[in-house]
Amino acid sequence: MADPAECSIKVMCRFRPLNEAEILRGDKFIPKFKGDETVVIGQGKPYVFDRVLPPNTTQEQVYNACAKQIVKDVLEGYNGTIFAYGQTSSGKTHTMEGKLHDPQLMGIIPRIAHDIFDHIYSMDENLEFHIKVSYFEIYLDKIRDLLDVSKTNLAVHEDKNRVPYVKGCTERFVSSPEEVMDVIDEGKANRHVAVTNMNEHSSRSHSIFLINIKQENVETEKKLSGKLYLVDLAGSEKVSKTGAEGAVLDEAKNINKSLSALGNVISALAEGTKTHVPYRDSKMTRILQDSLGGNCRTTIVICCSPSVFNEAETKSTLMFGQRAKTIKNTVSVNLELTAEEWKKKYEKEKEKNKTLKNVIQHLEMELNRWRNGEAVPEDEQISAKDQKNLEPCDNTPIIDNIAPVVAGISTEEKEKYDEEISSLYRQLDDKDDEINQQSQLAEKLKQQMLDQDELLASTRRDYEKIQEELTRLQIENEAAKDEVKEVLQALEELAVNYDQKSQEVEDKTRANEQLTDELAQKTTTLTTTQRELSQLQELSNHQKKRATEILNLLLKDLGEIGGIIGTNDVKTLADVNGVIEEEFTMARLYISKMKSEVKSLVNRSKQLESAQMDSNRKMNASERELAACQLLISQHEAKIKSLTDYMQNMEQKRRQLEESQDSLSEELAKLRAQEKMHEVSFQDKEKEHLTRLQDAEEMKKALEQQMESHREAHQKQLSRLRDEIEEKQKIIDEIRDLNQKLQLEQEKLSSDYNKLKIEDQEREMKLEKLLLLNDKREQAREDLKGLEETVSRELQTLHNLRKLFVQDLTTRVKKSVELDNDDGGGSAAQKQKISFLENNLEQLTKVHKQLVRDNADLRCELPKLEKRLRATAERVKALESALKEAKENAMRDRKRYQQEVDRIKEAVRAKNMARRAHSAQIAKPIRPGHYPASSPTAVHAIRGGGGSSSNSTHYQK
């Protein structure tokens, strides 16, 4: 505590305007204002106050005059009190509260809530503030907590400094004006009001809003504390004017009784002669004991009616204000000393106590000498100057025959009476505590009974609902599992079939490319043979012409000779014909020999093709196994990566094919050059054909070796994936067993709330899995669309190539037929070449027909796959809708469960509220230098100067 100082109570007088009833009644406006401090009622005497506020005064002006300075004093460590006094309907509640959320019409209390924080944010940044508020009312002379309506009869106690306080009152820590306003709104909703003839919203109780501010300097550790009482008194009433009856009349009696007790306290303090001030006559005066004549800066706002109808009450109120103005309060700063200061004070008091003990001992020795009849010389007598220089004497006991000092009788009686009075007051406080505890216990037990009944009924209903919902969800879960299994199986089949078809398409494309290469080679050979054939035809035509000319000449000669010789011409013609027939027979024999060789080559090529088909079938089987393994792998890998890999592989294949095409074109050019060089002999061509067949066999062996290596790698990968599938299946079985155990435990346990939470979590996990499966399905659908587009493009290009190939073949066949018709009797070499080309054409037509059949098979398979894809899409949509419904049901169940848990928590909190009336709360420290954050409920310790803010949590008990 700092050194005390004396100050008087400030009294402000406020007159309200005439209300509608007074204007309609024609009441006269009686006050006359003389300056800012004097008012005269009618023709009476003047009343002087610290400030007189006329009816046109705004709420802000009232606040600046009455409360602004007190806020600064409280933040400097003083106690403060502001209360409004006056008759009913005189504007007390309007002055103290006003319209809470209207910036123009809000009263003193909400303005103080904002002004406190404005002052704090402009103060030194090293200060840290803890602000807590409480709100209670005195109704029927019982203290009722407005923040906890279950506390209906609280007791008033005194702390170690004999300062009264309300025991058990709810205290809320606040850190922003919004939180203070929330507390005010909550408390105001619980306050007692009633309708009377003079006021539609008449307060039926005295309300007290207490703000407790503690501040600490984090550098110097200096601690200050201040309390601010904001009191809205209920107005005094005349029953003849208010028309109160029944419960309202009882309330009016208690209001007038407590206000008369307040008047008695003011009168006793104003006279200054009475030794006893009746603070204990009412609980309101007991709470305001420190505000009236104690350690507090107090401002009283007396509210008056200007109507002549209320002239007597107005004069009584003004007299009350004049008496209160004479009261003196002794105020001091509430300074909490630090440990070092306490230590210094203790040492100082210890030294003082030591010197006083020495003085007492010397005085007792001197007194003992006087009582024994010994005269003590003046130089040995102890004076006030010598007290500090005394040495401690021996601890000699005081003699027993010292006569006790008898005090005055009046002092003993006074002390005795004071002790009796204090003991009676203590008994009274104990009885109040006991009554309060019993009443709270009774209400608590009643509430517990109601809560238990309601809780039991609700838990039964909820248990039945939860059981029904659980069975329904189990059925839906099983159905969903079956559908998911079917969808997965269908997707697996679809993926396997698609991979097979894609592999077949790739094989066909490769075969097609090979055939196109062979076709290009054959076309080149065909063009060369056609050129040779044209040259031979020209030569044969020239020879025919010469032969015909020679024959004609010979025939002429023979005819001339035949005229002379009769039959020789026929013989010569027969001989000529015979020679021609021999040549034709030789050519036919040579052609038949070539045909037999070509047939043997065709049979050998067919055998090679059958072997290649077998290897292709084996390769397809291994590729199907590989596709199945890749399907299992693709379920665990991202489709995007696989697509990018696939595109890269396709790009590499395209580049390889382009490179191979370039190399083949180069080889083709070389072969053309070789063919031009080796056109002389047909045997060289046969050798080249044999070398090509050997190269084909070597390529086939290399392909078989490559496929064998691929097959081994695929087999290893398949075994590894099967092991992973077995492990996953074991994990699934373990999870299923765990789920069954949890379900069995759920049927046995009495409380189902935690189990429902676990089931909700499992349901969410399943939903997430289904969502992942759905995402994978969507990715697979997109991949399938992309592959379908690529397949369709490849098929289109193949179809176009087929058309071009057929057209080219038809044109060439027509040309060859025309050439055959033109040249029926060519040479044997020409016929051999023609037969060779015919055989090649037959092989090419067979290959083309096979490609057409494969294309038709693929087109037949395509609608089946599309149909299966549509079915899977519909099934997935149905699963999505079922999943959505299950999710919505789960959300509804969770909300209902959360509401039930909140209701149970509220019931338990209401049951245990009385038990933990003084339990620990989290304080919200405030530091100057910053305005509060956007969230009003956030716990912030704010430093000034734009520094960083750090969260700080303090626990107060």
Curated annotation (Swiss-Prot):
It is an enzyme of class 3 (hydrolase). Keywords: ATP-binding, Cell projection, Coiled coil, Cytoplasm, Cytoskeleton, Disease variant, Hydrolase, Microtubule, Motor protein, Nucleotide-binding, Transport. SUPFAM superfamilies: P-loop containing nucleoside triphosphate hydrolases. This is Kinesin heavy chain isoform 5C. Residues 174-315 are annotated as: Microtubule-binding. It comes from Homo sapiens (Human). It is found in: Cytoplasm, Cytoskeleton; Cell projection, Dendrite. Pfam families: Kinesin. One of its GO terms (molecular function) is microtubule binding.
